[in-house]
Amino acid sequence: GNHRNLHSFPTRRSSDLEINDEKLLPWLYTQDSQDEIYTDKKTWQKSNPSLGSIKLESYLEDIMNKSKNDLSTRVTMLCKDFNIKQTESGSWLTYSDLNNESKHTISLKNSYAIGAVDLSNTTDLTCAVLLIQKDNIKYVLPHFFMPKDVMLKRIEEDSVPYDLWHQQGFLTLTDGNQNDFSLVTKWFMERVQKDGIRPLWVGYDPWNALYWVKEMEELGFTMEKVRQGIYTLSEPMKQLEADLKNKLVNYNNNPILKWNLANTQAKIDINGNIQPSKLSSKFRRIDGAVALIIAYAVLNRYRNEYEQMVK
């Protein structure tokens, strides 16, 4: 609204002595706290002195109720409707949102899928996923990769049991101290040859993926470029959030993917667009969450074609 222009432009310029206008009196109406917005509607007048004429109380009440369960709505509302400055990132999912202990109790063999990867740099965690939709449930098959020589260091840094996850079959260790993306290719090929799961499209971020993409294309996979930007990932991330909250994503209770989802923040812009971001520590891996969001982005592009194939 106009309050943002008044607040951020003339006030800043006036304080920096860029302009000299004695007729300019910047004035910002705001709340004393965020909590009072949710506990006392009578306080809304503080940041909305024209409430009832320019802006209706019913509008604020509707958006306030929606914001309780929607991070991007909350950030946008606090900034635009109550003039409270927001940070760029916030927690994306609660544990109850992301936790789903359901297992794959139906056969996923001989299915059409959406594939996706988040390829790390040479020494970090890498993730590949297959997404299969059946009867409104999205079944996710994730698999993770890490260089063998850095595993002990990563166990100490990340404080998670990579060695146990490897023993349980959730994690493949590559020889040496660098990732071998040909093992990611091998995993996709095994799903095709052993399980009859055919990824119709495989999404990837073009950064660091040139040679791997060529290898996959030579084997007949259709590769889909998905750049990791806020406008590309916002809608699929919101859709994944809604599906997780409604328990429509069955990831076979994979502990690494669950940990990655718990580590993921939502970086938010002023328009309520979101994209995945790490929690404050650089050791909080989010690769599985990013790969799954990329899979959702590919599904959005080809939803009609995919749903026709899986009927």
Q: What feature does the model see in each segment?
A:
Residues S8, D124-V129, A209-E218, E235-K238:
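A short acidic (Asp/Glu
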Residues Q31-S33, N83-E88, N99, D118-T123, ...:
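Short, flexible loop/turn elements at secondary-structure junctions
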Residues G196-N208, W212-V213:
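Short glycine-rich phosphate-binding loop at a beta-alpha junction
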Residues G1-H7:
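Short, exposed "boundary/linker" segments that immediately precede the start
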Residues S8, R12-I114, T123, P142-N179, ...:
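Non-catalytic, compositionally simple segments
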Residues L108-Q133, K138:
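Gly/Thr-rich phosphate-binding beta-strand-loop-beta motif of the actin/hexokinase/Hsp70
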Residues V192-L200, L219-M223:
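Short, surface-exposed connector motifs at secondary-structure boundaries
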Residues R13-K46, E215-Y306:
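Metal-dependent DNA phosphodiester-chemistry modules and their immediately adjacent helices/loops
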